[in-house]
């Protein structure tokens, strides 16, 4: 896509569409496509054309994904609606970082009572951030252990019961009202806990960098640090000394992809390996390619 052939651009859009349709986390594929198009535009001094091209590609990929969602739900549920409940990840973060006093920010009395019901159940079990131990590793492990307990075991059943009691059993109606309720909680509570959200994000981001290249344990944590240092040194060498621009491009795109993916995951969920492993093979392939360029230059 750096060379922006029509075939390469169309293929990149198709791949991005398929990846996003399979897993919404793969919106990073569209972000990487955007980087390639914009870099190409800057290099060719035709930024305006690249921005327009990016807009067309993004509209095509996201529009196609939306149509697929609508079509799937129409076939399965006989109702053309978007995929629902994506906001539950953000709401889980809202509960994890909240304090009981944050209920005062929710204006709707019924939703406020629901918030307190879920909050008290989570707090009693020690699922919330203020129950985490001291130190980075304890915080990360507590968040990972608590996340599904908050969302799957506590919040989701309570929200579903709340909606069914008031709006009936229809799945589409249930999903719409559940999304609305979680949206109210998110908008009301999250802005008052930005500091704790940022702290959790940074903890998760570091954890995600580790689980991208290894596993999280006292020995491999240090290995991960060494691996990233070696990668960055080789990348800088290829930037300043190396002659193979394709290897440099691969190294840079893989690094950007890791940052995008880990950043996105860290915002909404804990960085377990199944969310970060997508870039593991790419990391080591790029590392070997850059190491090979350095070795060939050293050999002559």
Language-model segments: which ranges?
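Membrane-interface transmembrane helices that cradle and orient dolichyl/undecaprenyl
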Residues: 1-8, 298
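Membrane-interface alpha helices of multi-pass inner-membrane proteins
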Residues: 9-23, 58-64
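Transmembrane-embedded, aromatic-rich helix segments that form part
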Residues: 11, 25-40
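Transmembrane-helix signature of polytopic, lipid-linked glycan biosynthesis machinery
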Residues: 18-20, 67-71, 257-272
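Membrane-interface catalytic loops of GT-C/OST-like multi-pass glycosylation enzymes that act
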Residues: 22-29, 77, 265-280
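Membrane-proximal stem/loop segments at transmembrane-domain junctions that anchor or position
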Residues: 82-203
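Membrane-interface anchor segments at the N-terminal boundary of transmembrane helices
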Residues: 169-259
